[in-house]
Amino acid sequence: MIGKRNASKRTRQDDCITYEEYQRKRKKTFLNTFVNICSRTVTYAKLFLTKTPISELDRIAGEAIPSNSNSTNSKLEPSTKAPESRFSHINSKTERGYVTVESDMSSHNTLDRNSKPTVSHSYTNSSKDEKFLDPIALQNLFSPASDTHSQNIHDEALSPSSFRVSRSRYFPRPHRSSKNLSVSNRLQLAVFKETTSSTLSHGNSVEADEINSFNPTPFSSSPLHFTNSSPNPNSDIVTPDKQLDVVSEHARYKHLPFTATLRKKSPHDSTSRKASFRFVQSDQQPARNIVTSDIQNEKSLLLLIRDLKEKQTESFQDWNEVDFLQLKGLEISPPPTRPKFIPELEFPDNARKRALKYLNQSNSVSSSEPIITKFNIPITLKDLHTLRNRQWLNDEVINFYMNLISERSKIDSSLPRVHGFNTFFYTSLQRRGYAGVRRWAKKARVNIADMDAVFIPVHLDVHWCMAVINKSKKRFEYWDSLAGSPGKVFDLLRDYYIAETKGAVDVSDWENFMDDNSPRQRNGHDCGVFACKTAECVSRNVPVQFSQNDMPELRIKMAASIIDAQIY
């Protein structure tokens, strides 16, 4: 059982840089497992000596509740009545037979190693409607005449809004819910303060450090503090909820670069838009976090860049902070100014309505049935839904659209002669060289030497780019909406074109072209649309003029083009 439980914690060899590091981490994992076994053995021994019923501990594991008890050396002895306290409303609602662990959270830092929490059996039925709704009662609760030791609303022993903060300081939040943990792990959470503190994850450790350094602001007992209005957005007061939000955000994105400088700070984000008191009822429930689409796009872009750096060192190994900030256009310089995309192709209203109908249609059993089949590519509703906003395009959609571009050039003689390979061409060329793709043009019944432009989608695991062999302009082009370096793309294209044309076309004076003012994406989802639309513009020999703001409309046009098998 122990081996199965710790299987996910063991270090895999491919996660380590060297074999010595793998052996070192493996020994550390075995040592931690041995220490955990010893700790559980001591835990069972303590519970056996104190005669604590094992059957009741399943209910209390990991749910220690603070109280104002001042005992630091209490024994694990069951009582028949729950202690009465004027702050008993802070505790969870209990039912008959519910067991709680009561300890002094305010003096938890002064506990010695031999101190133990008190386990008490509560057999009273507390009222489920027990709330403080009267502002006067709340004012009296924190009045100077009160016999409590503090008037601070952020005190762990007093403030319901700070209860979650004080609990997170000592009791970790495991990856699984407490009821799914093993008995030994739950016993550790209920008995050992040192053990629970040491098992904090990195994110929770950062959160605990931030909370411990938090200096609460004095609380005034004026009735004005109990209004239903939201706090002043420009206030400098740092509430516990705001503290947890900041710490959680830092812990979640600490591995990403430039997060601190890229996030746009708004004066309305200085405090949480939620009242500090849980028991104050309000007619309006404002959102706790104001997350705009810009922030979501920024996070998705950061994650995309991180994945590209991890998986594709060829194209993104030379990136630095300055390059990324220039790409984002937040701190150093704005992104290239592009004119608003003006549709040059006819887009009928009925085609738009059909596209919106399919895009808004919910997934069903019939979603696996092809909507249209052409070029030996079936397009299902699931494939078409990749053209929804914030979705990645799949191979079927991109291949179908590239075939539409090739077919249009054959029908309309006024357009340049172009051919588009599918999404697997560059992967085969990269892995096997010309030998892996030497029959592709023959199967497509095209002569590459006669084509004015050849389009090759470049797939970088989680990112789409477009490479072009532009014979009419005598250059090899690379279009990347993230402005990444081309890597070996130009060399592979040059070698392929020379081998495919058998030297009939002289490419010695051809240039490697990258447009510094090319359209750039500002999220982590639209790279496929950028690549396809770039190929469509080059196939008509028109400037590549569109921007991130045009993506919703371009997605609809691509969906309509696929449904009607005609580019709009």
From Swiss-Prot:
Q: What does this protein do?
A: A cysteine protease that proteolytically removes the C-terminus of pmt3.
A GO-annotated cellular component: nuclear periphery
The UniProt entry, under Gene3D superfamilies, shows:
Adenoviral Proteinase, Chain A (3.40.395.10)
Skewed-composition ranges (Polar residues): 66-77, 116-126
Organism placement in taxonomy: Eukaryota, Fungi, Dikarya, Ascomycota, Taphrinomycotina
Kindly list the biological process annotations in GO that this record carries.
positive regulation of mitotic recombination-dependent replication fork processing; protein desumoylation; protein processing
Which family is it part of?
Belongs to the peptidase C48 family.
Q: Where is the composition biased (Basic and acidic residues)?
A: 83-96
- Naturally occurring in which organism (per UniProt): Schizosaccharomyces pombe (strain 972 / ATCC 24843) (Fission yeast)
UniProt keyword list: Hydrolase, Protease, Thiol protease, Ubl conjugation pathway
Q: Where is this region: Disordered?
A: 64-127
User: Enzyme class, one word?
Assistant: hydrolase
Coiled coil (residue ranges): none
- The source's domain of life comes to Eukaryota
* Gene Ontology MF terms in the entry: deSUMOylase activity; SUMO-specific endopeptidase activity
Q: What's the Enzyme Commission number for this chain? A: 3.4.22.-
**What is the primary gene name for this protein?**
ulp1
Name of this protein: Ubiquitin-like-specific protease 1
